[in-house]
């Protein structure tokens, strides 16, 4: 089975590579900052991405139909258990669960227009352009795989992520300032996870993938929150003892203040 998966992956890469013509465009991009600092007062922010599509040679012609841009931002990976509940005899009960393995904790997909106006449905699925087209590995009994797009667990997983601002899809999220210069704003909610974020920009024209470029940024804790996090990781035993002592002292102080004579 492993051999078959490897052969399928090679075939997919060959298909994608075959859809990219000889380099005629070069993508240059930059982001406004590579590090975002958060503390207890963090309410969210955004990162601005700028880029340009340049001919790779003086003889390359500008595309008559213009360029299309798709920006994908993926946060730290995590494993999530999605549970489905039903009301039985007046009580909400878990009736099923699904484990999503190593999926992005944050995922944003930004483009300059809807995907069906950029390329064919088959290419949209092949390149995994939209949220609905992304592969989310799941634990299915003893097997690991993805399921159909309208699977209720998968749909609910994406819906809940979008409600918290952790999954975003905006088909007007990329602005073409000129036919070759573009701008995109990456929204980061207050609950954005700490860690590294990968940014990928893909250029398409006439429905075909022409070029891609990658960048990255990170979200870090600063101030007292960072001190506490470091203490918990590096001095686990001491941190646990200190926390327990503080809880005991707080309880004792409250008992003294509010006791009745």
Model-derived segments and their meaning:
Residues 53-57:
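Short solvent-exposed capping/turn motifs at the termini of beta-strands
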Residues 195-201:
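A short tyrosine-centered beta-strand micro-motif
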Residues 87-193:
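Membrane-proximal low-complexity regions enriched in glycine and acidic/polar residues
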Residues 8-17:
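Bacterial N-terminal signal peptides
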Residues 25-41:
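N-terminal edge beta-strand
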Residues 19-24:
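Sec/Tat signal peptide C-region and signal peptidase I cleavage site
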Residues 187, 210-239:
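Short, aromatic-rich amphipathic segments at membrane interfaces
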Residues 247-261:
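Juxtamembrane interface at the cytosolic side of transmembrane helices
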């Amino acid at each position: 089975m492993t051999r078959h998966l490897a052969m399928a992956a090679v075939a997919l890469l060959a298909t994608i590579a075959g859809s990219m013509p000889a380099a005629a465009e070069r993508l240059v991009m930059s982001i406004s900052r590579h590090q975002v600092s958060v503390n207890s007062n963090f309410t969210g922010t955004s990162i601005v991405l700028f880029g340009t599509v340049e001919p790779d040679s003086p003889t390359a012609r500008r595309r008559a139909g213009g360029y299309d841009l798709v920006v994908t931002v993926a946060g730290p990976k995590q494993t999530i258990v999605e549970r489905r509940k039903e009301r039985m005899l007046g009580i909400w009960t878990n009736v099923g669960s699904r484990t999503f393995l190593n999926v992005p904790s944050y995922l944003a997909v930004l483009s300059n227009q809807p995907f069906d106006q950029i390329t064919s449905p088959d290419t949209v699925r092949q390149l995994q352009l939209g949220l609905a087209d992304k592969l989310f590995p799941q634990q299915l009994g003893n097997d690991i795989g993805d399921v159909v797009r309208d699977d209720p667990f998968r749909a609910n997983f994406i819906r809940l992520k979008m409600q918290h601002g952790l999954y975003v899809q905006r088909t007007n999220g990329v602005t073409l300032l000129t036919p070759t210069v573009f701008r995109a704003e990456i929204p980061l909610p207050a609950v954005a996870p700490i860690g590294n974020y990968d940014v990928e920009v893909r250029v398409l024209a006439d429905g075909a993938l022409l070029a891609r470029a990658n960048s990255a940024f990170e979200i870090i804790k600063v101030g007292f929150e960072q001190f506490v996090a470091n203490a918990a990781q590096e001095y686990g035993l001491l941190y646990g003892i200190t926390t327990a002592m503080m809880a005991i002292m707080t309880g004792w102080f409250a008992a003294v203040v509010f006791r009745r004579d």
